[in-house]
Amino acid sequence: GIDITGDSATVINKGNITVTDKDSVGVLINGDRATFANTGHIDVNNSATGMSITTSEGAISQAGSMNVGDFSTGMALSGNNNSVTLAAKDLNVIGQKATGVNISGDNNAVDITGNILVDKDQTATNAVDYFYEPSIGVNVSGNCNTVSLDGKLTVVADSELTSRIYADFDGSQENISGLVVSGDDNTVYLNGGIQLVGEENQLTDGSTVASNRNGYGKTPVITVDGKSSVYLNGDSTINGDLPLAYSGMIRLKNSAMIEIGADATINMQVDIYDHYARSESQMIFVESGAELVNKGDIDTRNIGFAAISGENSTGSNSGNITLSQYNYGLLANAGVGYFTTKGGSAVNNGTITAKVMEQESVINLGASLGLNEANTFYSDANSMMGLDAFDHGYVSNESGGSIEMYGRGNVGMLAIDESTAENAGQITLDALWVDADDTTTLRSNIGNDARSYGVGMAVGTNTYSGPRKNATVVNKQGGVITVYNAGIGMAAYGASNTVINEGIINLEKNANYDSSLGADSLIGMAAYKSGTAINEQSGVININADNGQAFYSDGSGTILNYGTICVNTNCLTGNDYNETDSYTSLLYTGGDVITAQNETQNLTQKASINDKKEGNVVNSGSLSGADIAISSGELVNTSTGTINNAIIINDGELSNEGSVAKVTLN
């Protein structure tokens, strides 16, 4: 081809360039301040390179289209401070282990106005051998480079299927990539959106790779590794046939950042979709200090939006995220808006909406599959979650945020295992909502436990792994949880797991109300398996539905009510209400006397000692009956006092000068 060495060279080519000899190069330029312009078509194959340019302060332009075949590179640019314009209508990467554009060096500016397609030719004789070897559309390495793509970046992923066997994948999906960015301070603008297209059984004989049963592959349209930024705009889509589902369409790590713009959309319209024997995944993975910012409109089916993992990894939403759940298979739930773990965090200032579009998609994990999904609150009716913090995760629904859940088995916010969830915005739950076009019915093994309808905020899990520990969710002052018809406002499962209401919980009914619903179907706060539910002094529970009740405990849980309960317009606060509800504990704080000397009292419901007010709680008489828990502060049993109740010290003190029957230090 063309071989130029030396500085300030100028090459203008108007013809086509075809490079097919092994390891050959169509245009080779080595020297600074080079100028190269080509208006013809470039076709490379067989380990060839269309343009290999090593220059600094150069000007490179390509106006013709480009096809890149096996083991080849369309354009390889190395050097600093170059200006590159690729005005080709199409850049097609169709070969095995091929790369469309490879940019290395620093401070290069690359402007691509056409479309980029990465679609390995699965009819090729070597397609099976390189099924798991990815081809790449654009590879950027180095620092401070700027890349702008005005067209659409499309990646096509093939899935090869075999016969279904129990609890194993239905086949294998290829590995393939769109944009790969490494290094620091690179900036990429994807103005035309991205597209992931699925297809199936494109290999002439895919039985070998299908029998590997690897499930979905690595199909990232965008991968960023390093402190670089990607700005995604335009309309993005996921479509075609994805019989093994997909995962990680966007992957960020090591302080990378992606912003999905305010005018951007991501929509999912698939023809075939299933992920049998594999739980739902996420569209975007963020780890090791990376950041995801969503300002756009996201509409997904049966896949979570983003997983945020690792210290200083963050996600935020000020746009709209809609999760839709269809019956694509036994294990095909729509997942989570934001899932955080291992120090990752996410905040919502926008709207997250989850809709069960087909009732049959609600799964009883244990009964239907015998599976254990550790990040699920209630495995007997599993659907979607708005925000989920698991294993040292943190999520927050800010004052401007809204989480809306429609259909059975949903949880607005969940915290499990040393995790925290906080709400200062709006959470709405309508478990009896059914989509107007839904022709399916609920599975027979989905029961009528209040948890099976849905929960606004929850801690813990009832899965086989155990409830985990030290998880906390708080409905903060200003936060509002509204539950229509059936379900629970806040629920705690497991010892050391706590839900706290400082805001408002509304129990309401609407047009979906079912008058046959009985007791324990619509609950403000509930505690299971030694969990704790606290309605603080600022907390209010409004009950405006016939089947509504403020509290529920399975007998092991603890309910502490310091706040106000309103049934229609009749409101009671603290012990004035607690004395009417056997699920709650009687509250004693500094200055209170349980029994005076020579008095006798039998407690018919649990009691709790706290330090809401200064001073000690004193007992000088004879006391029996239900358990007494010391949550904070000090209980003083004087020399004339006798306590026959079981005393449980959680976090406080007992000073005994009299007689006590049983003391347990928790």
Place the predicted regions along the sequence by residue.
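Beta-strand-rich solenoid/repeat architectures in extracellular/passenger domains
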Residues: 8-23, 33-47, 57-71, 81-97, ...
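Glycine- and acidic-residue-biased ligand/ion/polar-headgroup-sensing regions
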Residues: 615, 633, 652
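Short aromatic-glycine motifs in intrinsically disordered, low-complexity regions
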Residues: 284-286, 339, 494, 527
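Cysteine-dependent hydrolase recognition
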Residues: 5, 30, 78, 104, ...
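Conserved acidic
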Residues: 416
